[in-house]
Amino acid sequence: MAESGGGGGCCPPMDLMRSETMQLVQLIVPMESAHLTVSYLGDLGLVQFKDLNSEKSPFQRTYAAQIKRCGEMARKIRFFRDQMSKAGVPAKEMQGKENDIDLDDVEVKLGELEAELVEINANNDKLQRSYNELMEYKLVLQKAGEFFSSAHRSAADQQRETESQQAGEDLLESPLLQEEKSIDSTKQVKLGFLTGLVPREKSMVFERILFRATRGNIFIRQTVIEEPVIDPNSGEKAEKNVFVVFYSGERAKSKILKICEAFGANRYPFSEDLGRQAQMITEVSGRLSELKTTIDAGLGQRNILLQTIGDKFELWNLKVRKEKAIYHTLNMLSLDVTKKCLVAEGWSPVFASREIQDALQRAAVDSNSQVGSIFQVLRTKESPPTYFRTNKFTSAIQEIVDAYGVAKYQEANPGVFTIVTFPFLFAVMFGDWGHGICILLATMYLILKEKKLASQKLGDIMEMAFGGRYVILMMSLFSIYTGLIYNEFFSIPFPLFAPSAYDCRDVSCSEATTIGLIKVRDTYPFGLDPVWHGSRSELPFLNSLKMKMSILLGVSQMNLGIIMSYFNARFFKSSVNIWFQFIPQMIFLNSLFGYLSVLIIIKWCTGSQADLYHVMIYMFLSPMDELGENQLFPHQKTLQLVLLFLALVSVPCMLLPKPFILKKQHEARHQGQAYAPLDETDESLHVETNGGGSHGHEEFEFSEIFVHQLIHTIEFVLGAVSNTASYLRLWALSLAHSELSSVFYEKVLLLAWGYNNPLILIVGVLVFIFATVGVLLVMETLSAFLHALRLHWVEFQNKFYEGDGYKFAPFTFIFTANEDE
């Protein structure tokens, strides 16, 4: 069994503190029980199989044919799902167990149903195409018929008008006119015409191209169809125009036909005879009625077939997915030399050994195998996967940690502390118990409806909110807590726990100033005294309070991170990291910023007027100068000199000893000597394992180790300053949230109230609600969430968390049943 360390006694036993102890197991499974064994292990979901055939392509593996079969069945099931979705036929809940049906029977049944459904669809498509063509033809007959009818009427009217004019002219001119008519009638040209429909968006270009191609020797008329029509070729609705093109000559006709084809214009025959047109419309209408009846009958038959499929759809779907997953896993197993057994290797938690052996035994019995499977644990130097047992409450927090990087095997897990610190730091920036209650109500809806919502397909944003519902619950509860401390309810203070400790000295005292206020009662018991809100000194006081509080919280969390590095070093038995990483880092951080935190607390307790900026700056610039009025306690100057010296000494202690000790250990190991003062460290093992491959003497890159340590030291020293400053975002975002709340309340709600107009008040309330929800409950929540994320990923986790492991991914059927392929 692979173990990276054994000194776990320094921490209380908890499931999330360190990942589960893993083991590399080997399974030797008889061929006749292999399928059932993998199926039972998939139900168990506690074995991560290794691919022992990685050098083979997918087509060269033993069960490639079975996977191809399952893939074909999965294709048919996807086809059924699409058809059911289009027809609006729901799949019924799964009835029975997938183990009760045989895969061969499913394959035959799916093939029969697909063939029948494809035939019905083909017939229906053919009928629907004919129906759509006849609908277009009917529209052409109607619209073009209207054009020809109006043209005939116009020509008749014009003829009558011409005849009446000619009757009144001189009789001597009549023979000449008759002669001219006879001459013109002999020179008349026979015009042809084409009718059809063209997409409306192409109609203008279509007309222009026709005109240019025939050099203007055409006459075209178009009529708009009010309602969209279904195109016979694409089957989609489209807006179209009916066109009639008159031309002269076969050459022009061939050009027009080619242009119609290029523009996707559907052409239909048309007769000039009005009687024939009416007859054709009657015939087309009758044919449409017949087709409609036939299509409806076909759709009814198809829906009955789809309902039959829907009854068994989920069962077949799960069966095919499970079988495909089983055969994929079987392809990762190797055949032994006798070709009678399959050999599997994989990672599993130590606690699951008994369950795995029980599954192997059940598979052997249920498959009537003459020989049982063999379970044995292998020794290995490979790094095991990381596995944390989580529940629906802790899984979201663990996902937040894993998004930065998966913990190294049995490395201390930041998620244990993040469960509390993440929502708390969020709430420091989002401290308003009114807003907290709003988020709490929304979260309670997600939690109370979680069973219903879990079975539904949600949108991306809703799915993220639902997955992190318990994180949001903690965020809302802590927001209510910090909001009570800040005494803010939508920026309004309430004396919830007691009256204000201060009161006006006389009647002339204004509420907008603290001048003249005297303390008449005990100190306000919890949180901020409401008298501060609205006073002239409110902003300076809150700025000072929140800024100092941010530094205290930041230094505390960074110290926690460094302390966790000690537990890691002790667990992995790395004395070098304890003496030359943990101790110097603690000294450096607390000599500077730990000291600043102590000064803040002393100043709060004593009410001193000392300038802490001046104290910290001149601690470096002029350490020998007297502090004067900035002195907070006796011998402060001496203490500062000692702390400054310790901080300076701790830097070379972090940088120099560790690389030389690792080099000394490496040399002693290869000379057969034991290095007595210090235990073998995790870093030296890492160098040995990865330095020289399979050679007898691994190469030790001292320069690489030294540069790495130099970078790590510089990063910590500079990070101690920048990370502490980074925690000031707690103050900045808290102030921004408070000021935005105040602006929305005073400049929107109170302003609307002051007009004494119901309409303005309603508008003001609506604007206030939308601004509160959109800006404060959505944008500000997201902003505070991201800043809290940054504080944990960078400022906290970089003190101890390597995060270079890989996640335990067991073979399981849990997700197979819920996810699409």
UniProtKB/Swiss-Prot annotation:
Report the subcellular localization.
Answer: Vacuole membrane
Keywords for this protein: Acetylation, Coiled coil, Hydrogen ion transport, Ion transport, Membrane, Phosphoprotein, Transmembrane, Transmembrane helix, Transport, Vacuole
**InterPro entries named among the record's database cross-references:** V-ATPase_116kDa_su (IPR002490), V-type_ATPase_116kDa_su_euka (IPR026028)
Point out the coiled-coil segments of this chain.
97-144
Q: Which residues lie on this side of the membrane: Vacuolar?
A: 443-469, 570-581, 662-758
What span is annotated as the signal peptide, if there is one?
Answer: none
* CC terms in the record's Gene Ontology section: chloroplast; chloroplast envelope; Golgi apparatus; plant-type vacuole; plant-type vacuole membrane; plasma membrane; vacuolar membrane; vacuolar proton-transporting V-type ATPase, V0 domain
Q: Where, in residue ranges, is this chain on the Cytoplasmic side?
A: 2-421, 491-548, 603-640, 780-821
Q: One MF term from GO for this chain?
A: proton-transporting ATPase activity, rotational mechanism
Q: Give the main location.
A: membrane
Q: Which GO terms describe its biological process?
A: proton motive force-driven ATP synthesis; vacuolar proton-transporting V-type ATPase complex assembly; vacuolar sequestering
Q: How does it sit in the membrane?
A: Multi-pass membrane protein
| Known tissue expression | Expressed in etiolated seedlings hypocotyls.
A Pfam family matched in the record: V_ATPase_I
Q: What happens when the gene is disrupted?
A: When associated with VHA-a2 disruption, day-length-dependent growth retardation associated with a reduced accumulation and storage of nitrate ions in vacuoles. Increased sensitivity to zinc ions due to a lower zinc ions sequestration in vacuoles. Reduced calcium content. No effect on sensitivity to sodium ions.
Give me the segments passing through the membrane. Answer: 422-442, 470-490, 549-569, 582-602, 641-661, 759-779
Where on the tree of life does the source sit, at the highest rank? Eukaryota
Modification N-acetylalanine occurs at: 2
Chain's role: Essential component of the vacuolar proton pump (V-ATPase), a multimeric enzyme that catalyzes the translocation of protons across the membranes. Required for assembly and activity of the V-ATPase. Involved in vacuolar nutrient storage (e.g. accumulation and storage of nitrate) and in tolerance to some toxic ions (e.g. zinc ions sequestration in vacuoles).
Q: How does it assemble?
A: V-ATPase is a heteromultimeric enzyme composed of a peripheral catalytic V1 complex (components A to H) attached to an integral membrane V0 proton pore complex (components: a, c, c'', d and e).
Question: Could you tell me what this protein is called?
Answer: V-type proton ATPase subunit a3
